[in-house]
């Protein structure tokens, strides 16, 4: 279906034009998009923050006493418990995004949240490290579809140069809330002995209960795709669909087939986005799982290590939002990913090689700022350079799946025998940042070349099959 045919299929959609003065149209646009923002970003950010809390509280629980209780110090048990989560998390990313439209985003994502909340609650009652490992695997099953599903939904609502700010706010609000996981873990661990339950168990029980509560609420509040929404008026819905159609021509979902999925997976740039995402999530997961343990190894006590784990997340929010705003304003992605990658490298070098603990701690601030900012930047970079609902679904799922690979690497390269400095893990993380810079350069050169050939009329077909489309650098 051509872009013109798609527009004609909306009926009154094409009749919605700004008035002669334009003031009513501007007011209508602002009111509509403000409503979209308020109905999407806060609820998904809040729910995903608890997904992150439930995913990363393993390190805090171990610091609070779970390690000796479940004998996690024996061999590689802690790494096994950590890494098992990512196996179903990776495998189920693409299938989850392929069926999300079939079941409806709101119902499907609320079901996932209920599942992982129940598992998290159950983790508070495990008695052996084997049961803990089983719960971690189930956690990966239920969380697999949530993040790529939300990225898919957000990118369906906004134009290409609006999406990074929204992705940044969604992800960073979640990250900031989850950044208090160590403080919350410390507070919950103070319940040690209440009802004959260990302090580390209370961490899982309370956080799992809150997740279940939010999952019930989310069934009524989670957003769906634009054409299925219930909070906008018909004219507002048509307006949103129209602006997406004019921006990239994919407001109408294309039919999904096995042949089409395999065709999309043959695009090497989708795999490049995934590997780039893996590179920037590796340090994020390393900090999430090991920051309190690393700080304790630097000589701080349990309480201080847990409390000092939160401050590095504050400047990360400000930095990433600034780069997201600048990126959308200048309609440029790759250069800002490079800058934030260099910030990560600087922080890694300080943390790995400085002899002073305060400098190493300062390096964690820079590392967290760089990696946290790269995550929404890469998601926006990939979302801007695909056209079509089916390809957008595959791209977001594949990208986030590679984030799980970053989690596996982080879980295995930070080994018990390398405590307290974890130098081999830091070296691997540093190498991943250089790989990120290389792939950003490679995709930028490729997109520059394809844009030039398209402008010169030397291509047999329009880029991404969409006339007038050009890749975002």
Per-range role (PLM):
Residues 1-50, 56, 63-64, 219-253, ...:
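Intracellular terminal tails of multi-pass secondary transporters
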Residues 54, 70-71, 95, 103-104, ...:
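Helix-breaking motifs and short loop linkers at transmembrane-helix boundaries and internal kinks
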Residues 59-60, 259-325, 375, 379, ...:
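Extracytoplasmic gate region of multi-pass secondary transporters
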Residues 59-91:
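Extracellular/periplasmic helix-loop-helix junction of adjacent transmembrane segments
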Residues 90-130:
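Conserved MFS/SLC helix-loop-helix module at the cytosolic interface between two early adjacent transmembrane helices
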Residues 91-104, 318-332:
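Helix-to-loop junctions at the C-terminal end of transmembrane segments
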Residues 109, 336-337:
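Primarily marks hydrophobic transmembrane alpha-helices of the MFS/SLC 12-helix fold
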Residues 164-197, 204-211, 396-410:
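Glycine-rich segments within core transmembrane alpha-helices of 12-TM secondary carriers
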